[in-house]
UniProtKB/Swiss-Prot annotation:
Keyword Aminoacyl-tRNA synthetase: yes
GO molecular function: aspartate-tRNA ligase activity; aspartate-tRNA(Asn) ligase activity; ATP binding; nucleic acid binding
Annotated site location: Important for tRNA non-discrimination: 33
Binding site for L-aspartate: 175, 221, 454, 495
PROSITE patterns recorded: AA_TRNA_LIGASE_II (PS50862)
GO cellular component terms, A-Z: cytoplasm
Organism: Rhizobium rhizogenes (strain K84 / ATCC BAA-868)
Cystine bridges: none
Binding locations of ATP: 221-223, 488, 540-543
Protein name (Swiss-Prot/TrEMBL): Aspartate--tRNA(Asp/Asn) ligase
Oligomer status and interactors: Homodimer.
UniProt keyword Cytoplasm present: yes
Amino acid sequence: MHRYRSHTCAALRKSDVGSTVRISGWVHRVRDHGGVLFIDLRDHYGITQVVADPDSPAFKLAETVRGEWVIRIDGLVKARTEDTVNKTMPTGEIELYAQEIEVLSAAKELPLPIFGEPDYPEDVRLKYRFLDLRRDTLHKNIVKRTQVISSMRRHMGEVGFTEYTTPILTASSPEGARDFLVPSRIHPGTFYALPQAPQQYKQLLMVAGFDRYFQIAPCFRDEDPRADRLPGEFYQLDLEMSFVTQEDVWNTMAPLMTSIFEEFAEGKPVTKEWPRIPYDVAIRKYGSDKPDLRNPIVMEAVTEHFAGSGFKVFANMIASNPKVEVWAIPAKTGGSRAFCDRMNAWAQSQGQPGLGYIFWRKEGEKLEGAGPLAKNIGEERTDAIRTQLGLDDGDACFFVAGDPAKFYKFAGEARTRAGDELNLIDRDRFELCWIVDFPFFEWSEEEKKVDFAHNPFSMPQGGLEALQNQDPLTIKAYQYDAVCNGFEIASGSIRNQSPETMVAAFEKVGLSQADVEERFGGLYRAFQYGAPPHGGAAFGIDRIVMLLVGAKNLREISLFPMNQQAQDLLMGAPSVATPTQLRELAIRPVPPVKKD
């Protein structure tokens, strides 16, 4: 028999009754039932119930074992009585009668429990992550993550992609976040950067003639953490294709990702035909470029119904500024004053003056609008709004007015809030879509200049001619995002492979041809030697897994994440370098300047 096990803790079945077997694992739980000890032994695969009765030679040692000790047990497989069968466990029809126990490793008193809900402080969980990872939910999440990545690799191979790896030590490039820098010992005073994404390398692969590339790529960005983004590093399914239009990318990746979602969705419906929603439409309908399409609320402009109306706050705004619009946020079943007042109070908590509303109710046979706005604009306008939005008895509508560029985010948050409060969102489904036609440039209020809105390597719609003749803020890009349930899960574009167009685009944000050659020399040179039209995308693996398992944050699907302060509490990173290390790197630490 093997030194440690003949079976795993999930392997034994009724067909094994009468067999003498050996299993090893962690003591999950010990129970004393009238002098008979029951030990639940756990390993990576599952749990087996072990019985140690007082007549067993293993009983004396069994009395000493404690939770999370690692032990080996030899014993006889017996069938459980009918009234003790546990149908929720694969091994629930049998139990193992212990004949011999060996303690392989004792455990100290645990700083946190390893079963049940993780109600301990996060820093404790991260410091003892090796214990936290023994929890069933987290353990299964990590296994699911690995399975998702394996599925991605398999599916990508099936549609003709080949996996290539790109360098980790590279040059710094402006991808929209701070770089993690690595000092060079051989070249004092210079630094490598960890890649924020393999963007330039994958484009160079297309120039080199590799037709369809993909990679499970680690990416490093020195940015503040949030629920849907881990500090430090994250992983993406990175891909690039030659001789393609954006439709080719969409038609390749949407069915592929739908298949992956269906494989792990546990029966939940998944979008098969992804809608393609222009960025401007998404902003106006949903108040977001990553809309949750499970929420049925669709916003509409109702400016005309308030222009010249008796509600002077809106009417005066409309009359004094042509940019002003009034957007309606229809809320079916929201027609109670209590709900409307809660929404108004929430808006005030967000720094808004309030949230105007109308709700409709039947008075006898007549459907009437109620609330201060209805009184001010009158019955005819109120009914016109209701008709436009398709509302009825028991429904409500909220209104936001001003310059849409300034209020659309709040309007989108109000849409989400109303959908949540009214329980309109079907959470047991995956709604996927493409957001397309992103603006190529945006105005940076901080720097008072035009800047790239997203990926600077995207192809502008209209090409060089658009850059030469159009207002840059009106130019769209061949850029697209994939969105699932309100989360951006991918971003991609058709790339700009023309050196002239590349320089013209960067000139719009204040960079000269010399700057382009200095910062992106490899890519700029490559484009002068025959570059195919190409495009691609990058799907965020961490976010996709988070959605599939229903985790609340990314730390619940990552092996060894950092905390919110970008510290690895288990390994003690970041750490202080030794004087010798600093001398070798020609680095002298300078204390940060204290702010008053």
